[in-house]
């Protein structure tokens, strides 16, 4: 049966830890969409691991891992990340990771184009990671991209890459990009990549009887190309639909959909953020939560938890259970606010707005909770939480339509987790 872990907000919710926890029992762990723009950190046995394109199931020695068809793979980053994991003790990791032959190749060329496209936008930048994800997905949609399986065929990458470069040169003029170097490297990757490439359909059929399949979502619902705060989104489908499509899952095999919700809100890059706190509260959240992007190192924007957004996310992803993360970051606040409604021009909005400019204008209605002003870091039992912290959790649960909050994160370590049965 399949468990899918999905971000419910703007990403950086802390999906890595619950994925790590669930992967201990998983026989197969998969990434369905996105690329090396994603990033999360896992602390396991006092060792810190950073993941971007690779599934974090690699930490578990009995778990096979797949980078699925819906992803875009920057091959140098794939090998760099794999080497870093092996250097930290995961010696057999390269024997447990596979890539769909239908996944797209993200070239250095795409990263160069990403920067040029952002520069053209000037004051209206999307705030991408600069990793080339958008241009790569654009080439996929335009049917001129390169698939991973084609890397194994002599001459295919060179022919297609030269055509891509020529097209972008016509569009942007001279590029600060070494075409010959990238062609040379991919000629070398042809042999190096071969042991990792699989036919996903045959691979998934082979593992169809796996007792536990874990799908690791990247980014989050509000960054989804269709359902997110467009155009301030990533270029892939980051929700439930993307997981099913990117891995050709049988929907009837899905046992659990885990929505990961941070106890407050953060966002990296540009785009609307109704509950953002450009004040001492935001600075305190940023400092206490150590809110810097794993991929870019950029400081994350911080604000209060937004239940309007989370309810919208739940309506699309149909969570069966919630993992609430980083509750301990709120330990030292006198009061804690939660957004429960939006108004526009004095009128209550009945749904989450599709237009980014509308989200920029909404008036947020909050419910205010008294803080608990005591240390919850490392708590592992529900009864160890202060009463005010319990009330905060229970309120979120009600706002999510009764979807149970099964796990509560109380710190960075693997065992800093409360599980409510």
From Swiss-Prot:
It is found in: Cytoplasm. One of its GO terms (cellular component) is cytoplasm. Keywords: Cytoplasm, GTP-binding, Ligase, Magnesium, Metal-binding, Nucleotide-binding, Purine biosynthesis. InterPro entries: Adenylosuccin_syn_GTP-bd, Adenylosuccin_syn_Lys_AS, Adenylosuccinate_synth_dom1, Adenylosuccinate_synth_dom2, Adenylosuccinate_synth_dom3, Adenylosuccinate_synthetase, P-loop_NTPase. It comes from the Eukaryota. It is an enzyme of class 6 (ligase). Substrate binds at residues 294-300. Mg(2+) binds at residues 12, 39. SUPFAM superfamilies: P-loop containing nucleoside triphosphate hydrolases (SSF52540). GO terms for molecular function: adenylosuccinate synthase activity; GTP binding; magnesium ion binding. The active site is at 12 (proton acceptor), 40 (proton donor). Its cofactor is Mg(2+). Pathway: Purine metabolism; AMP biosynthesis via de novo pathway; AMP from IMP: step 1/2. Its main location: cytoplasm. It catalyses: IMP + L-aspartate + GTP = N(6)-(1,2-dicarboxyethyl)-AMP + GDP + phosphate + 2 H(+). Binds 1 Mg(2+) ion per subunit. PROSITE patterns: ADENYLOSUCCIN_SYN_1, ADENYLOSUCCIN_SYN_2. GTP binds at residues 11-17, 39-41, 300, 326-328, 409-411. Its EC number is 6.3.4.4. Pfam families: Adenylsucc_synt (PF00709). Belongs to the adenylosuccinate synthetase family. Homodimer. Plays an important role in the de novo pathway and in the salvage pathway of purine nucleotide biosynthesis. Catalyzes the first committed step in the biosynthesis of AMP from IMP. NCBIfam families: PRK01117.1, purA. PANTHER family: ADENYLOSUCCINATE SYNTHETASE. This is Adenylosuccinate synthetase. It comes from Paracoccidioides lutzii (strain ATCC MYA-826 / Pb01).
């Amino acid at each position: 049966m399949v468990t899918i872990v999905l971000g419910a907000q703007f990403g950086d919710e802390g999906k890595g830890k619950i994925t790590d926890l669930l992967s201990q029992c998983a026989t197969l762990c998969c990434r369905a969409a996105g690329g090396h723009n994603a990033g999360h950190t896992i602390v396991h046995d006092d060792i810190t691991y950073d993941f971007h394109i690779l599934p974090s199931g690699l930490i578990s020695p009995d778990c096979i891992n797949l980078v699925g068809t819906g992803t875009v793979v920057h091959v140098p980053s794939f090998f760099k990340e794999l080497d870093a994991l092996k250097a930290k003790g995961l010696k057999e990791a390269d024997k447990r990771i596979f890539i769909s032959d239908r996944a797209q190749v993200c070239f250095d060329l795409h990263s160069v184009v990403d920067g040029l496209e952002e520069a053209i936008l000037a004051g209206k930048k999307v705030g991408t990671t600069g990793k080339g994800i958008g241009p790569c997905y654009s080439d996929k949609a335009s049917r001129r991209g390169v698939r991973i399986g084609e890397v194994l065929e002599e001459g295919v990458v060179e022919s297609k890459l030269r055509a891509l470069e020529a097209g972008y040169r016509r569009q942007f003029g001279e590029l600060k990009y070494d075409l010959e170097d990238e062609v040379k490297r991919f000629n070398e990757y042809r042999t190096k990549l071969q042991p990792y490439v699989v036919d996903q359909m045959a691979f998934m059929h082979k593992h169809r009887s796996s007792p536990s399949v874990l799908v690791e979502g990247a980014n989050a619902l509000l960054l989804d190309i269709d359902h997110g705060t467009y155009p301030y989104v990533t270029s892939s489908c980051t929700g439930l639909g993307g997981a099913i499509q990117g891995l050709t899952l049988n929907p009837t095999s899905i046992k659990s959909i885990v929505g990961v919700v941070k106890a407050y809100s953060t966002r990296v890059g540009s785009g609307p953020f109704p509950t953002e706190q450009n004040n001492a509260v935001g600075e305190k959240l940023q400092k206490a939560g150590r809110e810097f992007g794993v991929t870019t190192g950029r400081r994350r924007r911080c604000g209060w938890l937004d239940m309007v957004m989370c309810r919208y996310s739940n309506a699309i992803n149909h969570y069966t259970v919630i993992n609430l993360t980083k509750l301990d970051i709120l330990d030292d606040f006198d009061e804690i606010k939660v957004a429960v409604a939006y108004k526009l021009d004095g009128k209550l909005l009945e749904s989450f707005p599709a237009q980014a400019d509308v989200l920029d204008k909404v008036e947020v209605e909050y419910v205010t909770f008294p803080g608990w002003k005591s240390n919850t870091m490392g708590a592992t039992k529900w009864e160890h939480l202060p009463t005010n912290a319990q009330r905060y959790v229970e309120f979120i649960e009600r706002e999510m339509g009764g979807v149970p909050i099964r796990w509560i994160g109380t710190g960075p370590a693997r065992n800093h987790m409360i599980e409510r049965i």
